[in-house]
């Protein structure tokens, strides 16, 4: 297992630690239609967001290694002379931005800041389905959450599984459900 922690893995960990464990163990969920759609529209959506935000310039699909974090930022936008990461989501903007989306953005902030050697206080999430942009600012509580998730993921990458914590609302449609055994399968209910 790699010791590089991708911001997507941080997002997944905060949504469901067991799913992050399976991904880190080399068993990623097969791409869903939404995932495939997201990849297809990523460049076009990032360009639309850059234009909407008035970016002076934009770099697309930027791979950054800033241990323990590494991954590919959908775009790095230069706004008012400062770099800001942009994450593209295929979905519509939710009423409240989920904390796992904010933590993923925080990880990109940390990576871009380290890679570019410039202070980065803001990340953007472009929700392509609705064409809306969320601005995520790095705050102390978000930094603490990021540090916590990175610490837990480092333990997972060293082979320590997370504590099982079933959530029926999340587990019901989860691809990893067959391995977690949080919920009985349909056959077991009969």
UniProtKB/Swiss-Prot annotation:
It catalyses: exonucleolytic cleavage in the 5'- to 3'-direction to yield nucleoside 3'-phosphates. CRISPR (clustered regularly interspaced short palindromic repeat) is an adaptive immune system that provides protection against mobile genetic elements (viruses, transposable elements and conjugative plasmids). CRISPR clusters contain sequences complementary to antecedent mobile elements and target invading nucleic acids. CRISPR clusters are transcribed and processed into CRISPR RNA (crRNA). This may be a 5' to 3' ssDNA exonuclease. Induction: Slightly induced by 20 J/m2 ultraviolet light. Member of the csa1-cas1/2-cas4 operon. Can form a Cascis complex with Cas1/2 and Csa1. Its EC number is 3.1.12.1. Keywords: 4Fe-4S, Antiviral defense, Exonuclease, Hydrolase, Iron, Iron-sulfur, Manganese, Metal-binding, Nuclease. InterPro entries: Cas4_exonuclease (IPR051827), CRISPR-assoc_prot_Cas4 (IPR013343), Dna2/Cas4_DUF83 (IPR022765), PDDEXK-like_dom_sf (IPR011604). NCBIfam families: cas4 (TIGR00372). This is CRISPR-associated exonuclease Cas4. Its cofactor is Mg(2+); Mn(2+); Cu(2+); [4Fe-4S] cluster. [4Fe-4S] cluster binds at residues 16, 171, 174, 180. The keyword Hydrolase applies. Belongs to the CRISPR-associated exonuclease Cas4 family. GO terms for biological process: defense response to virus; DNA catabolic process. One of its GO terms (molecular function) is single-stranded DNA 5'-3' DNA exonuclease activity. The keyword Iron-sulfur applies. The lineage of its organism: Archaea, Thermoproteota, Thermoprotei, Thermoproteales, Thermoproteaceae. Mg(2+) or Mn(2+) required for ssDNA cleavage activity. Can also utilise Cu(2+). Binds 1 [4Fe-4S] cluster per subunit. It may be important for protein stability, since mutation of the Cys that bind the cofactor leads to a colorless, insoluble protein. Mn(2+) binds at residues 74, 87-88. The gene is cas4.
């Amino acid at each position: 297992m790699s010791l590089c922690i991708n911001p997507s893995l941080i997002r997944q960990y905060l949504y469901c630690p067991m799913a992050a464990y399976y991904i880190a163990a080399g068993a990623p969920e097969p791409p869903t239609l939404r995932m495939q759609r997201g990849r297809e529209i990523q460049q076009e959506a990032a360009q639309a967001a850059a234009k909407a935000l008035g970016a002076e310039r934009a770099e697309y699909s930027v791979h950054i290694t800033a241990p323990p974090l590494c991954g590919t930022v959908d775009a790095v936008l230069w706004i008012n002379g400062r770099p800001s990461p942009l994450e593209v989501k295929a979905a519509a903007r939710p009423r409240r931005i989920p904390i796992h989306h904010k933590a993923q953005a925080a990880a990109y902030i940390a990576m871009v800041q380290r890679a570019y050697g410039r202070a980065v206080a803001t990340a953007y999430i472009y929700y392509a389905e609705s064409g809306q942009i969320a601005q995520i600012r790095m705050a102390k509580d978000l930094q603490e959450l990021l540090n916590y998730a990175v610490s837990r993921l480092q333990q997972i990458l060293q082979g320590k599984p997370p504590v099982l914590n079933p959530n029926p609302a999340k587990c019901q449609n989860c691809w990893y459900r067959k391995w977690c055994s949080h919920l009985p399968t349909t056959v077991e209910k009969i």
